[in-house]
From Swiss-Prot:
Protein source organism: Syntrophomonas wolfei subsp. wolfei (strain DSM 2245B / Goettingen)
SMART domains per UniProt: EFG_C (SM00838), EFG_IV (SM00889)
Primary site of residence: cytoplasm
Domain tr-type G stretches: 3-277
Alphabetical list of NCBIfam families matching this protein: EF-G, PRK12740.1-5, small_GTP
Gene Ontology terms: cellular component: cytoplasm
Record-given protein name: Elongation factor G 1
């Protein structure tokens, strides 16, 4: 039943305890009989070799478990900024999220990033303050940070209890009960009266909870004003309504590593996060009419699904992970890839549990599945019924910001490296490949040094390739500053059939890449239009200034003509390519460089030195914030100025400061700078 289905993601800053929490969830729901640990390298969700060795999540991993009659599809995502695209693609297809915060670290830089991503997709969420056993953990400070830094409306539903300064249990503010988790693995849950020393605090926070909820529900408001007893079931229903609407974020606490509170978190997931039926549906465009409609999760409707992840499995080949939005999908049936205008036959359907697979025959609306057998498939593609072709909203990914050059140790290895890189780039939309024609080097572009380090490791270990790598470089981009038009007639006459294509093209500044066809009355036959778009895209792969990819361009095909005999797809592709190159020269080409958002945590006495250094690196200071005698400095600095910054910061602060950075935006860089 869809009502009992939850599609959720676990998202957080690195080391907040995402994978540890997921491992406990799998154990308590009976899916596993042993708790894996990231520090021991035996966690079920981090099953890739480089994840086990580093103790971090690199790729999002899916699993499915059951709790109190509900089915929970879980996607555990990376916390490292280099792999933020994994969070992006996961949130696009999920209905809810658990955002984990470290009880000591609170709202950290990547916490803010994943929160913004969840806001972008309007994902209802629960906050879980983890690591309450850590020295320096402060539950109420984290609540305040969630409110102030994230602009959220936190609703505290549980309180931590400490005995002799040790985290010992949790007060449930809805039931007004105290819970302890005994036994080595926290299996023995005891429900007790609230300890006397916590009674006053619990009653205060219970009043805050009821007051906030009463503002949104008349029945609750009447009971509250009349001092009548309030049923826990009513509170839960009102909390659910406010969570699903995004009005409030329930906050609970625990220590996953110490096995305290995870069962209560599971209760909150099924009680407060939405089922597919609770949400307004997913937008789609009907291809025939370009009308925008809402797709509801009805298994009786026409089939539609969005592919959100591709992996190459050594046992079964290419696996396409998809969220089913409507209808049903059966193994062996033919589907229509509306993003590529192609028919595809589905081979087998699999349920995924980390690296383990379970074959199924059918999947229905609202669920998540892995598909084997799709040949020409990419992340963000829509699969649908050929009788009702439509396009679901795709997934936006950030541009790569850093690149390295690699060279095979012998020429024979170049083809093997190219094949391996193409397989990796099919899996990872933020990983790009290009070739330097002058040096013969292969350039790999990604979101950060760790991202590219993992790619290089995969090439060596998974594909058994031998190569040299260069130093990291900035992945610059080019764009245009004004509109330009070009008329190009491509005519080539040889002994036999000639080539002819005539295009009138306009380029102007835009967002991303957009192609518009303004051809009317058949001056260019419809079958040649895709070739024109292909030629434009090919020309944008290398800019006219320094050969970097060109971004943020809107291309409009205004007019043209053809020859009945000599015109061909190749002729129009070539004409569009040449026209685009000429347009780029006339449209005030400009260089763009990636700018990073920097956060530095330092003792106060080094603030002046750090700010001066940021300014000297062409940086812009955004904010200063004091917290527990520690200065938090935030600003934006071009990536080109940040190579080796960790060494510089150590020198400036005698090793007492730390920093993190994430991609912010691209901005113009003058060639003289």
């Amino acid at each position: 039943m869809l009502k009992e289905l939850r599609n959720i993601g676990i998202i957080a800053h690195i080391d907040a305890g995402k994978t540890t929490t997921t491992e406990r969830i799998l154990y308590y729901t009976g899916l596993t009989h042993k708790m894996g640990e990231t520090h021991d390298g035996d966690s079920i969700m981090d099953f890739l070799p480089w994840e086990k060795e580093r103790g971090i999540t690199v790729a999002s991993a899916a699993t499915r478990c059951f709790w109190k009659g509900n089915t929970i599809n879980i996607i555990d995502t990376p916390g490292h900024v280099d792999f933020t695209a994994e969070v992006e693609r996961s949130l696009r297809i999920l209905d809810g999220a658990v955002v984990i915060f470290c009880g000591k670290g609170g709202v950290e830089p990547q916490s803010e990033t994943v929160w913004r991503q969840a806001d972008k997709y309007q994902i209802p969420r629960i906050a879980y303050v983890n690591k309450m056993d850590a020295v320096g953990a402060d539950f109420f400070r984290v609540i305040e940070q969630i409110k102030q830094r994230l602009g959220s409306n936190p609703l505290v539903i549980s309180l931590p209890v400490f005995k002799e300064e040790c985290f010992s249990g949790i007060i449930d503010l809805i039931k007004m009960k105290y819970y302890t988790f005994a036994g080595k693995l926290g299996n023995d849950i005891a429900e007790e009266s609230i300890p006397s020393e916590y009674t006053e605090t619990a009653e205060e926070w219970r009043s805050v909870l009821v007051e906030k909820l009463a503002e949104t529900d008349e029945t609750l408001l009447d009971l509250y004003y009349n001092n009548e007893e309030i049923d826990a079931g009513l509170l839960s229903r009102v909390i659910r309504t406010n969570t699903v609407s995004g009005n409030m974020v329930p906050v609970c606490c625990g220590s996953s590593y110490r096995n305290i509170g995870v069962q209560l978190l599971l209760d909150s997931i099924v009680d407060y996060l939405p089922s597919p039926l609770d949400l307004p549906g997913s937008k789609a465009v009907i291809m025939e009419t370009t009308e925008t409609i809402n797709i509801m999760p009805d298994s009786q409707d026409a089939f539609s699904a969005l592919v959100f992840k591709i992996i190459n499995d050594r046992h079964v080949g290419r696996l396409a992970f998809a969220r089913i939005y409507s209808g049903k999908l059966k193994a062996g049936t033919v589907v229509f890839n509306s993003s590529k205008n192609k028919r595809e036959r589905v081979g087998r359907l699999l349920r995924i549990h980390a690296e383990h697979r379970e074959e199924i025959n059918e999947v229905a609306a609202g669920d998540i599945v892995a598909i084997i057998g799709l040949k020409d498939i990419g992340t963000g593609d829509t699969l649908c019924s050929e009788n009702f072709p439509l396009l679901l909203e795709t997934i936006d990914f950030p541009q790569p910001v850093i690149q390295i050059a690699i060279e095979p140790k012998n020429q024979a290895g170049l083809d093997k490296i190219s094949e391996a890189l193409n397989r990796i780039s099919a899996e990872d939309p933020t990983f790009k490949i290009s070739y330097n024609k002058e040096t013969g080097q292969v350039l790999l572009a990604g979101m950060g040094e760790l991202h590219l380090e993992i790619v290089a490791e995969r090439l060596a270990r998974e594909f058994k390739l031998d190569f040299n790598t260069g130093q990291p470089q900035v992945a610059y981009r080019e764009t245009i500053g004004k509109s330009a038009e070009q008329v190009t007639r491509y005519v080539k006459q040889t002994g036999g059939k000639g080539q002819f294509a005539h295009v009138v093209l306009r380029l102007e500044p835009g967002e991303g890449f957009e192609f518009i066809n303004r051809i009317s009355q058949g001056s260019i036959p419809r079958e040649y239009i895709p070739a024109v778009e292909s030629g434009i895209k090919q020309a944008l792969e290398e800019g006219v200034l320094k050969g970097y990819p060109v971004v943020n361009v809107k291309a409009t095909l205004l007019d043209g003509s053809f020859h009945e005999v000599d015109s061909s797809e190749m002729a129009f592709r070539t004409a569009a390519f040449l026209a685009t190159r000429e347009c780029l020269k006339k449209a005030h080409p400009r260089m763009l460089e990636p700018v990073m958002r920097l956060e530095i945590v330092s003792p106060e006495e080094y603030t002046g030195n750090i700010i001066n250094n940021i300014t000297n690196r062409r940086g812009k200071l955004e904010s200063l914030e004091m917290e527990n005698h520690t200065q938090i400095i935030r600003g934006c600095v071009p990536l080109a100025e940040l190579f080796g910054y960790s060494t510089v910061l150590r020198s400036l602060t005698q090793g007492r400061a730390g920093f993190s950075m994430e991609f912010s935006h691209y901005e113009e860089r003058h060639l003289a700078s």
